[in-house]
Amino acid sequence: MKVKNKKILAVYLVVFIFFMLITKIDFRTVEPQPYHSHDDASYYFHAYTLGIDFDLDYSNQLSENNRFYTTNNLISKPVPTHPIGSGVLSAPFIFFGNIIENLFFNDSNLRVIYFFYSMSAIFYFFISGYLLNKTFKNLGYKSISELNILYLLVGSGLPYFAFERFGTTHVYEVFGIS
């Protein structure tokens, strides 16, 4: 590996470790309930039903008389009101979290599925930085370094949504345009 690539990898590793140190892990093992914050719960239920049930039937996650969710008149079942996009991107993490939870933590109250769900936003945050770097290099912007892209991402406030409000769509939107 080139020396420059090793330095870039070292910078990304240090930044990743820094963000992992400031990430609050304690609340990540409690799944949102239908009465929790509407945004976070809505996106989580999209991802959960795709990653675990492999369908779009929310009846096993939501009650029909919940005030945060609409009822689809065609099927008379509750449906989260937020778009499904981030749920599609984070569903593979829930799927693998479910496998890990069933293999190793079957009798525990620890919710590994929700922890894996929270890691999806962090994964897409760092992949977005990598893709933006590649895009700028391919477009011929040689003066924009990897560190500048990291400054742009961190300065935009995106780490807050990746590490604290991981259920919202901000990180997934940046990934989509990277």
At which residue positions do the language-model features occur?
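Specific aromatic-rich, kink-prone transmembrane helix
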Residues: 172-178
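Start-transfer (signal-anchor) and selected internal transmembrane alpha helices
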Residues: 1-28, 35, 117, 127, ...
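Membrane-embedded glycan-lipid processing machinery
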Residues: 82, 93, 112-123, 151, ...
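Interfacial juxtamembrane loops and adjacent helix segments
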Residues: 27-36, 40, 44, 52-119
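Hydrophobic membrane-targeting alpha-helices
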Residues: 21, 92, 96, 100, ...
